[in-house]
């Protein structure tokens, strides 16, 4: 290492050694330098270049510390543990315990989910008391944390907001009526608003947000915030705080409700900021500006923003803002352009009759307003007539408030006539007591008109409820169901629709055109088709001979409808049995039974159709059951005996030596309720086949053994 000149030891040869060393270093520097730069002007040379080496990748990280889990204390916690931890914290911090909090903790039951409310309203919370609350917040979460009027100072508010942000303690937070949280309190609140993803509702009524605190809140609302509802009533927002807030909210897409009442907002700068906010923000749904000083000039700015609101704002409250008929002209021009505004409250403004006339045309052109507030707006009978014209023209108006106005007999008569035409208005608020009239009989007329108006609203309410019930029925009709369309007259006459046959050969299952919407039906259909193929392969050419020897199997053309003469595969056959299966999200399918066979005519009156019939044996009677019905319950293993089983008649032994008692082993007769399911033979086949397999096998075995003796 080079020794500085002031530290070099004195000696006669010191200067010579220093010069020699300097020349050596200069030569080495020039050799190593790729550019060959000249030495500095002062003659001093830099030291030799230093090299830096790094350890291997495995040795770079010597250790790691995981972040603390805020919920490590909240697993399987009990009420006693929470109370004990809170009391220990109070003793450690030497602060008083809150009896109201202890009572609420003892009432909590389900600690795994968010608890409905933690109510600390009216309790005085200093810094130490707030610090003790951390033992509760680290173990429990709440939906609502109510800190209204708790006398929070900057330190206590900062501590509480940090806890709520870290532990995500609340979705709804009320900090209203805390006038001393100061700048640090608002800074912590802004950090909480920005970082807490679960916080949706913040109530800061009567909590001043001054010039030096507003930038923090504005920054939190502009960057990202999960807040959907923000109450800032009486927060001293007029001026710069409102400008910062409105500018930030132009880019906020999450806030839905903004309440700015009682902030002394003026009709110039403040209203201009609100108008610009409405131009750029289309996600805000409720804007409450009651009890401010918007005036007609400010309403002009707001209406300019409303014209740009193709969608977004749903409720606008302008209650008590010194608006007159001049401002109603601006609003009347803006209303035809709004497509989302549903509630407009203009109460307690001296609008007068002229203002309502200026507003009427805009309201008629507007098709979105459902609720209109005109309470205490200096209206008389003349203004009520203009309102009645709007009622008669409106197909959507639900509620109208006309209280605290001098509406007498003439105005009530106009409103009553308008209600006879209107079928949407459900509530019309009027003063209960009739107004004084020079003619005493008019007072009774007013009472009668008031009753008639109320009856008209009740009538509309009944109509709306009927429409809702009809819509509910239509909705329920779209639920999963199986319905039979185009019922056949054959069912009414007692004839049984059987499965179709093709080319004169009976078929044991549904036709190939049939289909269903469920997987189980598809599996049953595949099984039945496999059985059919096995039957046809085993029978071979015996079908024609068996049919020729059994004329009873050939149905008479007189018993069939005219549509039965068409081929089974014809989709236009009028006797097709269509069964529709509908299910929301799974589509709509229709399967068709293309052939309908009926039993031979009987001398006795027709009986309800059954799949299996076993009457007492008598020689002259027709067959006991249609052959297709008997085959529906037959097992595939007995397909060899199938041609001989078909001509079974009462009073005669069955072919192949089967006894007449064979029919007794068939599945029991279905209940009468199954008559309506005439087209679902495949389902009946699947149900009965599994029940009668064992009995059929026993009878067939017995018949095969006794056949020689019976035929003799």
From Swiss-Prot:
Residues 639-651 have a biased composition (Polar residues). Residues 16-29, 514-531 have a biased composition (Acidic residues). Belongs to the PPP1R37 family. This is Protein phosphatase 1 regulatory subunit 37. The keyword Repeat applies. Residues 1-12, 605-626 have a biased composition (Pro residues). It comes from Mus musculus. PANTHER family: LEUCINE-RICH REPEAT, ISOFORM F-RELATED (PTHR24112), PROTEIN PHOSPHATASE 1 REGULATORY SUBUNIT 37 (PTHR24112:SF9). LRR repeats lie at residues 226-246, 254-275, 283-303, 312-332, 340-360. InterPro entries: Leu-rich_rpt, LRR_dom_sf, PP1-Reg/Actin-Interact_Protein. Keywords: Leucine-rich repeat, Phosphoprotein, Protein phosphatase inhibitor, Repeat. SUPFAM superfamilies: RNI-like. Pfam families: LRR_6. Inhibits phosphatase activity of protein phosphatase 1 (PP1) complexes.
